Every structure is written in C-alpha cells, then in structure tokens.
Amino acid sequence: PISGIGVSGFPRREERSYMPAFMVGLGQGQTLSHLMNVPLHIFAHQENHILAALRDLAHIPTDPFLALHLSGGTTELVYCHYQGEGIFESQIVGGSKDLQGGQYVDRIGVAMGLPFPAGKHLEALALQTTEYEPLPSSVKDGWISFAGPCSAAMRRISEAMSDTDKSNLARAVFTSIGNALEKMITYHTKEKPVRTLIAVGGVMSNSLLRKRMETYCKRSYLKLHVAQPQFSVDNATGNAFGAAYLQESRG
C-alpha cells in the first residue's frame, strides 16, 4: 500500500524559485494525497537529484558536502548542509557562466549529424578511442565557461570528417568537460573544505565523466556518491527515497 507521496514542487528551495512544469506534478500529488489520505512531501527539483544519489547510502550526510549538478539545462556546484525534514540549506558556489554541460554536448553532437539529445551517441563515439587533440577548458574564480571550448570544437567539424576524426573530437569534448569540472571543484574545496562530493544530473550518466570523477575524488581524498546511471537521468527515485526516508525517520 502507498503510505506517502513525494513530488517536485519548484526548481530550488529559494524564494521566487518557480517553474510552471512542476505545477502539473504538484497538482497530481496534492490530489492523490487527498484522495488516499496519505502525507505529501514536497521537494525541490535539485533536492530530488541529490536524494537520488543518496538513496544507495540509505542515510543523508549530516556534514556539509558539495553537490555537482550536471544536466542539459544545469551546470552547478552547490554547497549543501542537511537541515532535517528533507530540506537542504544550499548555496550555488560554482557552475557555468554561459553554456551548460549538456548544451555543449548536444551542440557538438548535432553539428556532427547525431540525433538530439546527443549525449549517448557522442559517448558511444568517444568510447571508440583514447586518442584526441585537446580542447581548452576555461575556469575563472571557480566558474566554468563552456562557450569557448564549444566554439573550438565547432571549428573542427566538417563534412569531410572521418569516423576516426569524429571519435577523437567526441573524446576531446568529454575530456574538456572533465578538465573544467576538476578545476572548478578544486577551487571550491579550497574555499569550503568538505569530505564528500555528490554528482547528479543526466550528464552524470556518462561513463567517461563518472570514471573521471571517481579518479579525481580518489586522488583528492573526497568521498564520491553518484546516482546509478538509470537514476541520474530520472530523479523520481529521489522523490520516492526522500518521502520514504522522512516517514521512516518520523516513525
């Protein structure tokens, strides 16, 4: 039997954080909660992503941690401190100043003739090689710019590209993203020392970036928690885990 409902109500737990897309699910959750006479737990979209990564731990860290949110529409590094009741005090400390990580991937993939969204297709190309001509990575004061690397990658695309050229460029794109993420995280762990990094969002389902973050965190003595690939894309599992966790902790 259903004993509770978890739902996304807004993008972030901030004043004036609003997006019409969340109203549909919120309304459905409110209706079901009323009809079934069960509690409704409302989370921020960002909290859901974080909870999706924490579900395998079965508990929520009480110490502050960094959450890397990398998706088609978001590139953010968030300083988080759990306040209880499923609520995180959070502060965006880094991210991208222009293109988001997913946009960078999609623009290059589509320009190379791949279907949209291009992430999985570009990853498949990148996995065919370990060779590439490096692309730049731009990070200033803990903030990334993907526009420059994207422009540099675009200049390499032509109709005369061989399959090998395409694989090499795909590898270079993901390597440049990984380089930028490492620089950004390193900057902010010096500013706000933490022991845990949680990586969430659809782009984190990419095997190359996951491996890159695993290697980086091991080298940097950070505990890394990443939502399983199938849960990185769809954060509904975060809603479910958050609701179940709250009800269990409340008895």
Residues covered by each model-derived region:
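Short beta-strand-loop/turn "lid" adjacent to the catalytic site in phosphate-handling enzymes
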Residues: 1-27
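Glycine-rich phosphate-binding/hydrolytic loop that grips phosphoryl groups
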Residues: 49-52, 227-251
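Conserved phosphate-binding catalytic cores of ATP/NTP-utilizing and phosphoryl-transfer enzymes
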Residues: 38, 42-66, 241-243
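Short glycine-aspartate micro-motif
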Residues: 4-6, 21, 65-69, 198
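Adenine-nucleotide phosphate-binding core of ATP-dependent small-molecule kinases
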Residues: 141-147, 151-198
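Conserved phosphate-binding/catalytic loops in two-lobed NTP-binding clefts
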Residues: 197, 214-239
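Glycine-rich phosphate-binding loops at beta-strand->alpha-helix junctions
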Residues: 194-213
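A short helix-loop
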Residues: 61-63, 68-71, 76-164, 245, ...
